[in-house]
Amino acid sequence: PIRSSAASDVYKRQVVFGAADTFRAAAIDQLQVWAAKVKADIIKSEINSDPASVAFKTAEFAKKNEIDVALIDTAGRLQNKKNLMEEYKKIINVLKKIDESFPNEVILVLDATTGQNALNQVKEFSKIHNLTGLIITKLDSTAKGGVVLAICKKYNLPIVAIGMGEKEDDLQPF
């Protein structure tokens, strides 16, 4: 299987992570662990700092250093949380200040146990910026992920990866 470190090991691409989930200290710590595992740079800030600032610094670092892939991890958000959706909009806007073509991809991570609410999530996220793909997680649980087919068809979105656990090798290309 292709591991999460595929970008740096297999494809010989440079990767930088942006720890833009600044609300949970554990999120920053987890991303640091993953960055070390996959030999990626990481841009981070203090807890409760502005997530859009971290996203900006990450994209700026990637562009300046000719990094192939910048992955910006944001706080988990539901489409009915207005302040988090506004933050998502702000992140998109600050990325465009660096380069109008940014972000090149926006991949929404959906929990397979979410059910029909996933349709609403995709709809609301798509209003802010076009999504380019989905990652479906928790397919190792009892979830069947049936709504995913409806989402893919309605929004013409590919599934780029599926999560079958929490280990390094459990995120599989699809």
PLM segments and residue spans:
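Redox-cofactor binding/interface segments in oxidoreductases and associated redox assembly factors
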Residues: 72, 108, 136
